[in-house]
């Protein structure tokens, strides 16, 4: 790192920019600061998401969205997502769903898309799209419009210490959870309708258990 004669400056929110003798600029500084910025989990997620996207140069023209969740010491949950893949927490006792991810929609990020030379289409009967193609403003792949979209994730840090929740992420369900599964799926369907608006009420919307992964965060125990 020292031999490359690179200078790093922090820009806040766990991000950094750098300049090198070769004139190449690196944003988010994850190759250089090695987690020393105030938000190390953000740097980690950005680094991994970008590394994955950069490794797609020899791949096809397809694309994908993604969501990840890292549980730290049973107390802190770091959720990162690109596109419209979602992480939703379901509070069993309260019967309430909480979205932990951020939907990356073209209209929300129109300024950034247009700044990169792209455009957002709004056609009646269809969702807004980037360059009349992609329905999300961030994604992996999609090389044909790569210059107009981003693969940088939104990172949410959630304190889960002392609370008991059901976190759905997609493994086989144990028998003891079957009683709450139907309740969760119903709430998740209602949540999706609420987020997307009344237009979904006219669709045959259903969330199947095979689409959902599950794990439980145990209650925090004081010592």
From Swiss-Prot:
Residues 1-22 are annotated as: Disordered. PROSITE patterns: PPM_2. CDD domains: PP2Cc. Its EC number is 3.1.3.16. It is an enzyme of class 3 (hydrolase). GO terms for molecular function: protein serine/threonine phosphatase activity. It comes from the Eukaryota. InterPro entries: PP2C, PPM-type-like_dom_sf, PPM-type_phosphatase-like_dom. It catalyses: O-phospho-L-seryl-[protein] + H2O = L-seryl-[protein] + phosphate; O-phospho-L-threonyl-[protein] + H2O = L-threonyl-[protein] + phosphate. Keywords: Hydrolase, Protein phosphatase. Signal peptide: none annotated. SUPFAM superfamilies: PP2C-like. Residues 1-212 form the PPM-type phosphatase domain. Disulfide bonds: none annotated. GO terms for biological process: regulation of intracellular signal transduction. Belongs to the PP2C family. This is Putative protein phosphatase 2C 63.
């Amino acid at each position: 790192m020292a031999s490359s004669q690179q200078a790093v400056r922090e820009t806040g929110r766990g991000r950094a920019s750098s300049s090198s003798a070769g004139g190449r600029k690196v944003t988010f500084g994850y190759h250089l600061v090695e987690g020393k910025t105030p938000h190390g989990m953000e740097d980690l997620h950005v680094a991994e998401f970008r590394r994955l996207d950069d490794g797609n140069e020899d791949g096809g023209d397809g694309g994908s969205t993604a969501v990840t969740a890292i549980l730290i010491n049973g107390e802190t949950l770091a959720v990162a997502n690109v596109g419209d893949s979602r992480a939703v927490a379901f509070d069993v006792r309260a019967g309430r769903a909480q979205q932990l991810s951020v939907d990356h929609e073209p209209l929300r990020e129109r300024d950034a898309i247009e700044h990169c030379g792209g455009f957002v289409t709004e056609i009646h009967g269809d969702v807004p799209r980037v360059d009349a193609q992609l329905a999300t403003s961030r994604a992996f792949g999609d090389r044909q419009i790569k210059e107009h979209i981003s693969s940088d994730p939104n990172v949410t840090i959630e304190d889960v210490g002392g609370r008991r929740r059901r976190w759905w992420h997609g493994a086989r369900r144990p028998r003891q959870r079957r009683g709450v599964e139907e309740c969760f799926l119903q709430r998740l369907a209602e949540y999706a309708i609420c987020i997307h608006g009344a237009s979904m009420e006219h669709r045959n919307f259903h969330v199947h258990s095979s689409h959902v992964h599950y794990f439980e965060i145990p209650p925090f125990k004081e010592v």
